[in-house]
């Protein structure tokens, strides 16, 4: 390249050293300086011209000015006009000068001064050949040319000697930064980057630009180096970081017109237009943009443009002689070949610039330099061009570019999708292409699956894909924005080793490498000298390696077992490792050593996988061949793994490295088979006693692994590990198992670890374990779960028996409990007709029925537990604490019919003599011991037991507390009893606990259907206890307890209530009425009682708040009496009707139908509203107006405002209670006269108690009349108006009676620790006019 052909030397010497060149160059410089100075003088005045001015011959007036200044005023106007006239004249003179210069240059060039590479060009042609995107209008303003011409004025020493500048080319090497415009440029002649003429670059330095090499053809390589001329130097201002090119830099094939345009672009522009001056500035901007993408567009190779074409086009230069044209053609051809390789070298340098660590140097010397005589079968890479850049490469045998391009994009897309560990294999599998694999298509890699198709054909001679020069030139434009992502050989080897260790299925891409050990190490592991980017370019690679080295893809138990495998490495033949890597494999010794280490590591890992597969195979063989070898009766069977023979080893060899074919069938057999016999499968499963010492386990782990017994040790370690996991798991879950959890979870975890039995069959197996008898269940548990410890087996067997018993007895008990409840109701209703019978008969019949029920339901003996409850109750333990205690919970759970169990015996019902029940003596306890009282108790106990459905929590504490406190309060009760009434006063209280078997049974039924009621009743335990515990001063708890309970009683139960229940409830009603009156009278003067009410507010917040918010002032009682008299008639009737239910359901029952949950809440709200209304009631009537009260019942039932008030209360209450009272209307009328005798024995006014009894009877009559009017729908308003005056008089009399008996307001204060609930209405002590309470008033007795 440094030696020029002889004819070219002579031509350049004769033309450039002519003495006549110096004067005209000086003339050009002077002319340009003059024109530039004149332009600067006119430039301020040119900015005032507008674009809409009429066109003038001067080209400077057609361009809109860049900026606009203020129009001068005064003197500046005339000056501007004068300058405007002179400007076109000056421009014309400048154009004439330029045309003269051009005319002078034309003949001078024709003489041969610049005949070698340049020549004149007419101004018109220059304007025509200017590119569309790079030129402006021919009338460009002169200001655009100013920054281009300014460097000419600098006192450059070489600028002063243009002859030397034009005649001495630099002999130095070419230092170029290759750049090109985008391929989308139109194929028009453009300004070249590397000018052939030495002079124009000095005058008008243009940015580097690659011209269009072939007319109407794709762009060629960026440029080539022509023979440098002698003693030529060039100083070119640098634009866009481009290095100055020598004067000999010539495009590889320039058309004649392009050459001429490139020679004098600016001078010719000055002659006709300023287009090229402006074009040069635009080329500078375009060149700056193209420098940023200097490698984004690659040129077509030389093969697309044969040398003949280039030579013909180069020879078409009309300025050269025939000899010169031939020389130029030859030089262009040779230089184009060299530039092709230099271009590819520059591509490598660009990649070098993109990678800080110089990835080409990190890979070492990838290939040798090019050799012109190299063999075609052994192509050499093109990277290291610096050593022998003069040598040209020979033709290479490359793969099909289309195939390589498609495979590259497939692999390139896989780099960012799927598993990262598969990238190296997918890339390298296509990176080694053989000579005869051009038409072979590489299938896409399947992630999460293993492809059985060989991607390439393995041949003895492999040529790296990346060593091919031709495909790179085709692929580079597509990947210029994204650098290639190819792993280094070491990284690929690691990724491949971990990939194979993570996935037991191997691709049979290289079956020839599978030898004795069966290790398939494809050639992709031995990738060498491949173009890749370091980890700094791709920060995800270090993380990838860490993840792969951390064995994230391996299961946890496989990772744990790898430590065992690393202890005892298999004795692998050394020739197997050497056979993996060929001797002539082009890798360094260090890289070979690292690859061998990774291969060994892979073999060790996969050896463990093979052992596990062989273990599963041996397990299936043991199931089929030796089903009866294990011992039964709870003893662990011996370890069966030692029975493996040489035949199984041969099977292991067959399966060893064919996992892609064997894994799926074996997994299907292991996970898909359903064993026919559970005991047979479990016997055949290898097991071991969990009491193995750590020394024995360690000794087994450190046993040397032999080639023939390697699978035995693997099975031993694996099974030991499984047993340890199971032992720890059972230890953690043993407490949960004892608490009642299903053991299926334990079985499922065991089966999941073993992977020997399907999880879906665990339920069937558990049902087999749960035998009908505990003895068989224990045996089966020991046989199946013999690997567990004896204590664990025993606990598991007991739990299975309990679980089986619970499920066996659950459904029958739920069905039988309601049936027994109905039977007991019938028996109790029959006992109501036998009031004259002895009390012992009732007790005996109750005891007999209880024994019968217990025998039927198999109730476990709970006598000791009930004694414990009685003991706690005798100590006055609060019922809320008792209900929350474990003993109380167990007592509630006990009568549910779960049969007693025994870990070593069958289930047996408890004997009749041991049935836990309440003693008959406390049940029939009476203070007086009279026969009538016992009969009353027997009658009331059945009905009270029947009504236990309402509140579930008052079952045992109510009974126990009553029994514990009867004796303590008997003397106090006698002190308050009136003569003749002491016997009947305590009848309802003692009758509460008369029939405990029915109460317990009803509680069980309630607990089955309404578990939510327990929460509501837990907040009211003391109220329930107060019903039966407090016989005197604190007896006021009874009405409120009944009120709370009545609000939860289902109305459907009231409809089906027999007549005997009503009788019993009416007797209870008498006692409640008397105690309500006493409570109200004593409450205003009892501050302690009021304090206790305040202290108990948290227990009853809703009712108390409702009463407190609606409590009227005592001063407004009379006004409310007149305003609420008529509307209150219906509430009285309704509350009286409700009191009928209250008498029936005085005590809480433990059973409610499912409809109670929503209906009970409505009832409760209704009574809250009633309580607020009760406070505003006037004084009650006295007993002297009994006849008036009887007549008043008709008035109440015929009230017209009753229906309106019922609408306010709620539609639910209207429907339920109307139906209930309509059903019992006739029965109440029949028994109305039987209960007029006084039953309350209190030292208060006897007339008041007698009046209360008649009030109760009045409530029944009112309910019956209400039902009748409800059905008829025609209220009698006239009767109501006619009877309003008697009602008023009765109330006034009752107020006077309340004032005559203030002594009743003083109760005993320390009778019971239970204080009245907070929701009792309080009457102000300051008011002495109204000391009554609506609770003992006739109008509110039904509450």
UniProtKB/Swiss-Prot annotation:
Biased composition (Polar residues): 165-178, 627-647, 923-944
Membrane topology note: Single-pass membrane protein
Chain intervals for the UniProt region annotation (Disordered): 55-88, 106-235, 624-654, 895-951, 1080-1156, 1309-1331
Transmembrane segments: 23-43
Basic and acidic residues composition bias: residue spans: 1104-1123, 1133-1142
Primary localisation category: membrane
Transmembrane helix as UniProt keyword: yes
A GO-annotated cellular component: membrane
Pfam families recorded: DUF4599, FAM75
Alphabetical keyword list: Differentiation, Membrane, Spermatogenesis, Transmembrane, Transmembrane helix
Cellular localisation: Membrane
Record function comment: May play a role in spermatogenesis.
Family membership noted in the UniProt record: Belongs to the SPATA31 family.
UniProt name for this protein: Spermatogenesis-associated protein 31A6
Species in which this protein is naturally found: Homo sapiens
Lineage, top ranks: Eukaryota, Metazoa, Chordata, Craniata, Vertebrata
Name of the gene this protein is made from: SPATA31A6
